[in-house]
């Protein structure tokens, strides 16, 4: 095996395991390690594919996945894993949802709601937080008025912050909304309730998007 693999269980909010077990900082600290690759699956099928990919990978690699029952949705979307490349689930224009890991499930709910409201909307499964898909990110502002990043990690050092830095470095003007957990410890509680409290559930995300579009 050519890789140094880290399997990150309990990534994101874990609810009943308690405050000390909330996995909401790992994207931030893992992304600071030179040469580290950080990825997360959207469902159980992609987790299997990522594990197989990691076995033959050369270099340090971390796969993060959440606690609880494995998500079985979006099974028909199973493009091969390619280094630093995302996966388009719905390709349209208007609003772009770029979701990482477990937030793809939430993003699919948001996408369906926005479509019902009459908005054109794309959905991208980021797959990699490091390295992120720079080619995909460069393409989005050409056909989208709003780019929304979605992650189950704190804001500081997270996926959304890296995307914002990328657009700034490229001097790309785009409206960007980062959906992430506030920079604070999250208490013990039911995971679904906690997601609503920190603003990363589908209802909260839709509200944030509507507010952003009104600006």
Map each language-model feature to its residues.
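Thiamine diphosphate
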Residues: 13-23, 56-215
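Short, small-residue-biased leader/transition segments that mark boundaries at the very start
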Residues: 1-7
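Conserved thiamine diphosphate
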Residues: 10-56, 208
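Alpha-helix C-terminal capping segments
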Residues: 3, 32, 166-170
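Acidic-residue sensor for enzyme active/binding pockets
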Residues: 4, 46, 151-152
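Active-site nucleophile and cofactor-binding loops and adjacent substrate-binding regions
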Residues: 8-9, 40-42, 152-157
